[in-house]
UniProtKB/Swiss-Prot annotation:
Gene Ontology biological-process annotations: nucleotide-excision repair; SOS response
Xref: Pfam families: GIY-YIG, UvrC_RNaseH, UvrC_RNaseH_dom
Assembly and binders: Interacts with UvrB in an incision complex.
Gene: uvrC
Name of this protein: UvrABC system protein C
Residue ranges occupied by any GIY-YIG domain in the UniProt entry: 16-95
Source organism phylogeny: Bacteria, Pseudomonadati, Bacteroidota, Cytophagia, Cytophagales
Similarity-based family: Belongs to the UvrC family.
Biological role: The UvrABC repair system catalyzes the recognition and processing of DNA lesions. UvrC both incises the 5' and 3' sides of the lesion. The N-terminal half is responsible for the 3' incision and the C-terminal half is responsible for the 5' incision.
UVR domain span: 209-244
Amino acid sequence: MLEKEDIRSLLKELPSSPGVYRFYSIEKELIYVGKAKSLRKRVANYFTNKKNLDQKTRSMVRKIYHAEYTLVNSEYEALLLENNLIKENKPKYNVLLRDDKTYPFICLSSADFPTLTTTRKIDKKKGEYFGPYTSGRAMHSLVESLRKTFFIRTCDLNLTKQNIDAHKFKVCLEYHIGNCKGPCEGKQEKEDYDVSIIQVRNILKGNFSSVKKYYQEKMLSAAEDMQFEKAQFFKERYNSVLGLEKSSLIVNPDINNLEVYTIVKRLNRASVNFMSILHGSIIKARTIEMKAVLDETEEELLMHALFEIHEEGWDSTKEIICNIELPILSTYCKVSIPQRGDKKKLIDLSLKNAWHTLTRYDDQKKEKPEIRVLKTLQADLSLKELPAHIECFDNSNIQGTNPVAAMVCYKNGKPSKKDYRHFNIKTVEGPNDFASMYEIVYRRYKRMGEEGLPFPTLIIIDGGKGQLSFACQALKDLNIYGQIPIVSIAKNLEELFFPGDNDPLYLDKKSESLKLIQQIRDETHRFAITFHRQKRSKDALLKTEFENLVGIGPGTVKKLLTHFKTVKRIKEASIEQLTPVIGNSKATILFQQLNK
């Protein structure tokens, strides 16, 4: 789910303009498309009024990892673009969240003599589906028109060749009033029926020209024959088809198989907007931000963007319109810069989105460098949350002597020294880094759990797969494994290991993510080494000061140091001050020997 900081940034950049927003999961899957009269207000509802959301919507919001949007000129255009994008991409949650209802489809059945029906449930075994349709009235009108225009049967009889030859069926009223040619009695051949089905399929795919032409001819013919009632009927059917055609468009229906590209540039930054038009509908929209490294021209930058979008070549592209000259593409397809008309309106709409993305950068560049690096780290490690709270662990010992460990904490990309912790290893004998790592991780998060403190959003282990495995076991024994992302960084090769994955991740040596991890690892190592040296020095001092004292063993020395903290304070203590710590007898012996 998006972090609070990301949500605030998103809502801040969203304009109060009509548009279409798109939500993506962490797997970069498009999960929801929505429309809005005001993008800022609509998107804010998902994150600021969670109590008013139903269970399905809350589930969707938890999976939002990234958001994009496209500006349009009106709320109506937002509705149409939303519908086109849903049809093209079929996002998971659009089926679940559409006002608690599923939009209807037209089904062309797979029977020998196919039928046309409407349905809200899809079963691909039963036929071919077209839709969804936002206007049920227009959809039913189209089905009725197609049935009557092409004499499509309305019955559900099993019209196999065997049944027809056996004369099992009789024609119904639809045949007698001229709406059906009677295939049930063999009065219409299957080949003739299939021709009609081909025409119906083409229309359902967006080719309305044939049916419009048919209605126009029928309307004129009826008018010439003075059959005005019949002419009015065909006029109504013609208008209903026009209405349905209009509801599926955001641009001129005559514009087909067209791609729109615009580029805007400011200093060394550029923004490229792309739109794909099919049968008059915008079915794809994308904006790419670019940076000119070697002072590339607008044409060079745009070509880079085009080749990224067209990874598989240019075979399907018939025409491109753009706001700059692209002579290099003229051999592949038609390229033009429209100056007027509907294509010019498309260019203007594309430029609107390109400029919006470019000017948005002015706000983004004000973002703190630490947060930017954390976002990069989040993306590189595929983390669900921004790693705003990172804790890193390291062991330190010399041949098993004075084993200690350290944990450093980074919050919002900076050291939080008040949260640093060091550990004396208590349960491990000898040099065993794996067992020591288990102990300190277990102790750290057991205590945090008992005190109700928030867990970090990322744990880093200084070591390889062995240390990582023991750290993970500690989390498992605490029943919190899986709640906190954890990785280890191995020395020398700077390999990053993840639980359950034998293959390491190698980040670019120059990447900000790796530099941050190295900085945290090195700081942990420094803190551990410093503590280890202090402990060795203290132990050496104690040995020098107390090793020749009679009747004072290591256990007594440890009690004294725990209470008085320093050797100097122990030496300055009176018998009365020593007695509560080690007893009167030892206090007297110690005091007498220290004050000879």
